[in-house]
Design a protein with these regions (language model features):
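Cytosolic-side transmembrane-helix boundaries in multi-pass membrane proteins
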Residues: 140-154, 224-274
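Short loop segments and helix-boundary regions at transmembrane helix junctions
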Residues: 39-93, 128, 188, 194-207
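Hydrophobic core segments of alpha-helical transmembrane domains in multi-pass membrane transport
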Residues: 3-9, 31, 64-68, 112-125, ...
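Short, non-helical or kinked segments that cap or interrupt transmembrane helices
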Residues: 1-5, 46-59, 134, 158, ...
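Alpha-helical transmembrane segments within multi-pass membrane transporters and channels
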Residues: 17-64, 213, 218
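Helix-loop-helix "hairpin" substructures at the membrane interface of multi-pass membrane proteins
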Residues: 104-181, 204-205, 209
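Transmembrane alpha-helical segments in multi-pass inner-membrane proteins
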Residues: 177, 181-245
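Transmembrane helix-bundle core of multi-pass membrane transporters
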Residues: 63-128, 229-237, 259, 264-274
Length: 274
């Protein structure tokens, strides 16, 4: 949903503005859209105490269908095209640093730095703030949190909305450097994000490493033709594109048993049961 709203916004306004200003504005728009869309999930799972897996799956099926329907209704085709004016050839000063400049500050997108910033802020908030402590408590033992005066429903609503905001931003960040022709799909990478969370064992530092690992897998799937050794191998193109998904299955097979999710994750809270 975030990818659709963001790319559609860029498609409409790219003739009036361009570059980083348009991209940053699009990110704000998708953050709001993602937060609003997540309210449907929050209401179903918190107020109605619906099964969160079913609610999430329903919304996940609805989002691409809504994107395709809306795109075809407005412009007659499923694909939404946009002009990539967001690529940064070199960050001033930082791009001139030997080795590091070539790796991190040349041929890049501002979304990379936004993603790193979001990770750092999220890691700090979860570990070092009152809200983070309450959020973890409502995921581990909501009854105990409720007994000391924490509004479990309010905190869980906040958690779901924040997740929606980040998911919306993530959808746009995925599409921008990948293609200039969005076809209402993010190729299942939202589910790979869940795999990153499980592989990272719900810990910030491990999630960072897991994200880096899956980033390498995605790079191999997308840019294998630029690597002479991989290009020379008699392997079909389709197999390279399967690398992130195959890696996900292998990683989850070996790590899912050791990954401890919050004990109350996915369980509706009934105040009368504590």
């Amino acid at each position: 949903m975030g990818a659709f709203v963001g790319i559609f916004f860029i498609n409409i306004f790219q003739d009036r503005m361009s570059g980083q200003k348009l991209l940053l504005l699009a990110i704000l728009i998708v953050a709001v859209a993602g937060g609003l869309f997540s309210l449907l999930h929050a209401f179903a799972s918190i107020n109605m105490k619906a099964d969160q897996t079913i609610s999430g799956t329903a919304l996940n099926l609805f989002a691409p269908a809504f994107a395709i329907f809306t795109a075809r209704m407005i412009q007659g085709v499923q694909q939404i095209q946009f002009t990539d004016t967001f690529h940064i050839d070199k960050v001033p000063v930082l791009g001139d640093i030997p080795v590091i400049g070539d790796m991190f500050f040349q041929n890049c997108y501002i979304t990379t730095y936004i993603g790193i910033g979001i990770f750092l802020v999220a890691a700090y908030v979860i570990k070092n703030t009152r809200f983070g402590l309450r959020l973890r408590a409502c995921g581990e033992h909501p009854g105990a949190a409720d007994s000391v005066g924490v509004n479990v429903a309010k905190i869980r609503y906040a958690g779901v909305i924040i997740s929606g905001v980040l998911a919306g931003i993530g959808g746009l960040i995925f599409v921008i450097p990948t293609s200039t022709n969005f076809n209402a799909s993010v190729a299942g990478y939202g589910f790979l994000a869940i795999a990153v969370l499980i592989f990272g064992q719900w810990r910030s530092n491990k999630i960072l490493m897991a994200g880096f690992f899956f980033g390498i897998m995605k790079t191999l799937a997308s840019a294998y033709s630029a690597i002479p050794f991989l290009k020379s191998l008699p392997i079909p193109n389709e197999l390279y594109k399967m690398i992130p998904y195959i890696a996900t299955l292998i990683v989850l097979a070996f790590s899912s048993k050791n990954s401890q999710a919050p004990r109350a994750e996915g369980i509706p809270y009934d105040k009368g049961s504590r």
